[in-house]
Amino acid sequence: YCTRQILPGMVRRRRGHIVNIGSVAGSTPYPGGNVYGATKAFVKQFSNNLRTDLLGTPIRVSNIAPGMAETEFSLVRFNGDAARAAKVYQGAQPLSADDIAEIIYWVTGLPPHININSMDVMPVCQAWAPFAIHRQEM
């Protein structure tokens, strides 16, 4: 609904950049993440289709897809179980909200003729096999 409200003004002004936050889970599944992954796959496809619909305008659309990021996500996922949520990040160095903000700042600061369609971002401790996490010995 936010896009629907703000997009007409962007088109009229002939400037703007819509940044959607997806997830690498929208491209690669993980156990127990079926609904979350499906919604993030939608965000990616919505972003791609919106950019296609805006072809011929200078409006940019980007989908930023973080991997493991230490946010309230795990706390919500585990119904408020703080100990279980903390174990997700134990021994790893996940992305932070500041890291994602820095990426958004960079993407939106590029010259106006450049559009980053989608960007997968993971901490170096994470890989695609499937979302394997290397943990340091504690």
Specify the residue positions occupied by each region the protein language model found.
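Short, flexible catalytic-loop segment of classical short-chain dehydrogenase/reductase
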Residues: 66-76
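Active-site helix of classical SDR
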Residues: 3, 39
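Residue(s) in the substrate-gating loop at a strand-loop-helix junction
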Residues: 23
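Active-site loop immediately N-terminal to the catalytic Tyr-X3-Lys motif
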Residues: 28-34
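A short helix-coil junction within the Rossmann-fold of NAD(P)-dependent oxidoreductases
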Residues: 5-14
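A short hydrophobic alpha-helix cap/turn motif
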Residues: 11-12, 54-56, 69
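Alpha-helical segment proximal to the catalytic Tyr-Lys
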Residues: 8, 48, 52-55
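C-terminal helical subdomain
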Residues: 63-67, 83-130
